[in-house]
Amino acid sequence: MHLRRVKTMPRHSQSLTMAPYSSVSLVEQLEDRILCHEKTTAALVEHAFRIKDDIVSSLQKMQNKGGGDRLARLFLEEHIRNITAIVKQLNRDIEVLQEQIRARDNISYGTNSALKTLEMRQLSGLGDLRGRVARCDASIARLSAEHKSTYEGLQHLNKEQQAAKLILETKIKDAEGQISQLLSRVDLSISEQSTKLKMSHRDSNHQLQLLDTKFKGTVEELSNQILSARSWLQQEQERIEKELLQKIDHLSLIVKENSGANERDVEKKLSQMSARLDKIEESQKRNAEGQRKPDEEKVHGRISKLELQMTEDMKEMKAEVNAGFSAIYESIGSLRQVLEAKMKLDRDQLQKQIQQMQKPETAM
């Protein structure tokens, strides 16, 4: 025979300020458990009576059959044990139920006290809320009056803002027109300066080309003169050599014809002729060297003069170009400074106007 065990509820310390919803749930749990215990006790009692009926019927059968004392005693002992177990279980269940009833009483007392404190608090809260509602009504009336005055002020400020916005838009348009005019002037001045720079570059390049062609022509002329002088010197040298050879041949013929003459006279004549020839060669060499040196000096002098003239012309051209560039750069810089100053002034005026327009907006 198996007995049903009843679950007991653990003891918990219940505080006086317990929430009403939790107390109600605990009461419902206790009632459910009491019903469960009643059902189990009823089932156990029914089971005990059924066992008793079985024992009585078995004893009657054994008495009818005879010799069943021992078996009857065993059934009685088992029945007594079951009854004692049932009684013990019932005692335990009764104790548990008593404890649960005490806990329920404590919980109900705590819930009642909590409800009383809640009622007191609600009453005090209601009085406080009524005072707050009265204060809120007064503040709402005051705020409505302030809202009306602020709304009127906002409408007035909105009108002023629209008027100031129109004025600012017109001023911005005027400033934009002035800025566009200034930019167009700047573009025109820059284009004029660029055209001037291009013209000055072209003029300087043209002058440099002219100087280059002039220098090349002078160099070619000097080279032609040097070549002509060299060819003339070679021709003179060849002519003198031919004349000397002709004279030597003539002297050799004379010597052959006058072979019978005195050898001393011939030797004297030959020595005189050789001396004359030496003198003629020396004089020709001197003349050639004298002519070559002044020609070379003349050529070198002309080349140095041309070089000096070229360097002076180049220096003058560079000075003119640099002066033109510096004047152009100075004019561009001054124009840029003037434009930057004017744009800065216009920007400052616009910022001041925008700040003046933003002040009423921030106040709104």
From Swiss-Prot:
GO terms for molecular function: molecular condensate scaffold activity. Interacts with DLG4/PSD-95, GRIN2B/GLUN2B and SYNGAP1; the interactions facilitate condensate formation. Belongs to the FAM81 family. Facilitates the interaction and assembly of proteins within the postsynaptic density by promoting the condensation of postsynaptic proteins via liquid-liquid phase separation. Required for neuronal activity. Accumulation at the postsynaptic density results in enlargement of dendritic spines. Its main location: other. GO terms for cellular component: cytoplasm; glutamatergic synapse; postsynaptic density; postsynaptic density, intracellular component. Keywords: Coiled coil, Cytoplasm, Synapse. Residues 75-107, 158-189, 261-287 form a coiled coil. InterPro entries: FAM81 (IPR029619). Residues 281-300 are annotated as: Disordered. It is found in: Postsynaptic density; Cytoplasm. The keyword Cytoplasm applies. This is Protein FAM81A. Expressed in most regions of the brain (at protein level). The keyword Isomerase does not apply. The lineage of its organism: Eukaryota, Metazoa, Chordata, Craniata, Vertebrata.
